[in-house]
């Protein structure tokens, strides 16, 4: 049976803006209050999805969240009509208001953790939405994320959906941004790597001091238990706390894995040798490539600024691997020089493809942030909601949908306009019909 890794990218929502909400994410903070282009951002995302589909990859799309989140504002004491709620919140609590307008769900690497059927005890693909407790604006997402995932992967014969972990910092979970999987073939049993930033219940362990560690060891363990993973195919690795304090807020900012390759910066992990020995032992026979980038080749600052590791590492139809990189990598001399050399080395990585995702990059998210990876066999793939799969016709429909509903320019001040709320709801209501999702948003269930 054929096996695939399918990338599901998040559609950028109509309220895409630069509010600088993500403390610990340097790019997000640096671009706070800049004017955004929701239309351009959505089209950049769609163009990347289509480009991967044209490369022969199987590509899906996940719907965005409904924003502004008026229900969240009502829970916090704002009342009256939707227009009154928006105006009150924007005036009385602007930071909270902006958090309730975030389009951050476009970064679907944080949507959930996914374990393929080859790894799980019951032979199903398992999904656990991330609770994203560390950032208020993202903690609003898990319930609707779960709705969207259930509507996309609806067949209970093949897909198992869990509730997100408790909404508490002790179980802070950031999803696939801190999870990767190494395997020989996508349909074979692999080794799942869970990367965490701190221990919630043991303060004697190393932890960052400046920026928060968003993923806990205890959360990673819980997800592995929920998914029915065996100890024989799970490795827990602590991210280097010093890197978190320098702006490496998720592990996918400093490493990326695919099949038998782990591409990483030498400073990425604690106890690297011990962790890699465990990976090798659990991976078993076969070539396994640990591609280490040393500081002399690419400084930590250049790696973070360019998002060298927040790239997608994909396997092409001919078996060679390609790095899907933001144009920021091409524009950085040290990073560009390294990548040009990398494709000539004796590793599976033979191609670099650059794509413009600057609207996302300015908010602190590169190509890898924009996608959720789901490994499936052909039977499971056939059971996915086919209206969420990218092809020429759906690409055209979604582009037309963006043209019809999205604004060219959006400032933070525009977010209080009830017309934007109504535009967004109209757009998303139409999108759920395009993607055949049913009613996944609270405003559709009134």
Swiss-Prot record:
Binding-site list for substrate: 19-28, 110, 137-138, 214, 252, 363
Name assigned to this protein: N-succinylarginine dihydrolase
Enzyme class: hydrolase
Organism of provenance: Pseudoalteromonas atlantica (strain T6c / ATCC BAA-1087)
Single GO biological process annotation from the record: arginine catabolic process to glutamate
UniProt record similarity statement: Belongs to the succinylarginine dihydrolase family.
Description of how the protein assembles with itself and partners: Homodimer.
Involved pathway(s): Amino-acid degradation; L-arginine degradation via AST pathway; L-glutamate and succinate from L-arginine: step 2/5
Alphabetized UniProt keyword annotations: Arginine metabolism, Hydrolase
């Amino acid at each position: 049976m054929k096996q695939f890794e399918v990338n599901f990218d998040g559609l950028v929502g109509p309220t895409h803006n630069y509010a600088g909400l993500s403390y610990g994410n340097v790019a997000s903070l640096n671009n706070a209050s800049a004017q955004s282009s929701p239309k351009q951002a959505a089209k950049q995302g769609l163009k990347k999805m289509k480009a991967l589909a044209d490369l022969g990859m199987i590509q899906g799309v996940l719907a965005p969240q409904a924003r502004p989140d008026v229900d969240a504002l009502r829970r916090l004491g704002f009342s009256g009509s939707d227009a009154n709620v928006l105006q009150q919140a924007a005036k009385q609590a602007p930071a909270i208001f902006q958090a309730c307008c975030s389009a951050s769900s476009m970064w679907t690497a944080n949507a959930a953790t996914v374990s393929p059927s080859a790894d799980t005890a019951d032979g199903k693909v398992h999904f656990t939405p991330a609770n994203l407790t560390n950032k208020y604006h993202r903690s609003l997402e898990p319930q609707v994320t779960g709705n969207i995932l259930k509507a996309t992967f609806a067949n209970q014969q093949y897909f198992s959906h869990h509730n997100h972990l408790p909404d508490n910092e002790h179980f802070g979970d950031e999803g696939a941004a801190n999870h990767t999987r190494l395997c020989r073939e996508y349909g074979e049993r692999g080794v799942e790597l869970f990367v965490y930033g701190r221990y919630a219940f043991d303060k004697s362990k190393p932890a960052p001091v400046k920026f928060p560690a968003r993923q806990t060891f205890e959360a990673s363990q819980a997800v592995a238990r929920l998914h029915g993973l065996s100890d024989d195919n799970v490795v827990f690795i602590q991210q280097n706390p010093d890197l978190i304090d320098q702006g490496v807020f998720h592990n996918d900012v400093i490493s990326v894995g695919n099949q038998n390759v782990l591409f990483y910066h030498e400073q990425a992990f604690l106890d690297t040798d011990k962790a890699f020995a465990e990976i090798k032992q659990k991976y078993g026979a076969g070539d396994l490539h640990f591609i280490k980038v040393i500081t002399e080749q690419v400084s930590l600052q250049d790696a973070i600024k360019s998002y060298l590791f927040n790239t997608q590492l994909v396997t092409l139809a001919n078996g060679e691997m390609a790095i899907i990189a933001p144009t920021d990598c091409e524009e950085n001399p040290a990073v560009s020089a390294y990548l040009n050399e990398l494709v000539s080395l004796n590793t599976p990585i033979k191609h670099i493809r650059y794509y413009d995702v600057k609207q996302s990059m300015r908010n602190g998210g590169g190509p890898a942030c924009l996608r959720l990876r789901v490994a499936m066999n052909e039977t499971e793939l056939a059971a996915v909601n086919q209206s969420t799969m990218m092809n020429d016709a759906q690409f055209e429909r979604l582009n037309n949908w963006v043209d019809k509903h999205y604004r060219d320019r959006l400032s933070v001040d525009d977010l209080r306009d009830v017309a934007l709320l109504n535009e967004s709801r109209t757009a998303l209501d139409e999108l759920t019909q395009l993607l055949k999702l049913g009613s996944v948003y609270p405003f559709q269930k009134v």
